[in-house]
Amino acid sequence: MIRPLLAALAMMTTLDSALAQAIPDAATQEVLIKTTLMSFNDANVTGNYAVFHARLAKPFRDQFSPEKLKTTFKTFAEKEVDIGFVVAKAPIPDAEVKIDDNGTLRIDGHFDTQPSQIAYTLKFIRSDGDWKAVGIDVNIGKPPAKDAPPPAAAKPPASAESGKIQFGK
């Protein structure tokens, strides 16, 4: 009697792990992208990184204080960069969305904006029951030429402003 129960419990645990690692659908990805970038933008525009910090994954929050975030992204604040308008734009993927062996969801993309393009790499883990950011890399620069090949996920456009921070770095 105990053996079948243990087998059923093991299957449920495996199924639960598999479900937790499912790639979110396109609508959820867009919400993750936009909410992360808008929290990031609000922090840069106001100079208050407390709310942005609170929305990050716990391991990220433990490693990076709001003050460290402010220092890391000071270029955006100094140049008064405001990317709030991206909420009205559709994100364009630059690479296939994937979850690595550590359970980190990676989303690479950009927004078709002029005169500069906003490119991002966002990394999320499951934290407190939701996908929360553990890495953010935002680059604002000239978009690639129309006849140029699509940008590689690892190579952002020539940046006027950029900032990157990631858990464990």
Positions of PLM-derived features:
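Short solvent-exposed beta->alpha transition segments
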Residues: P24-S39, A50-T104
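Sec/Tat signal peptide C-region and signal peptidase I cleavage site
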Residues: L15-A20
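Sec-dependent N-terminal signal peptides
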Residues: P4-T14
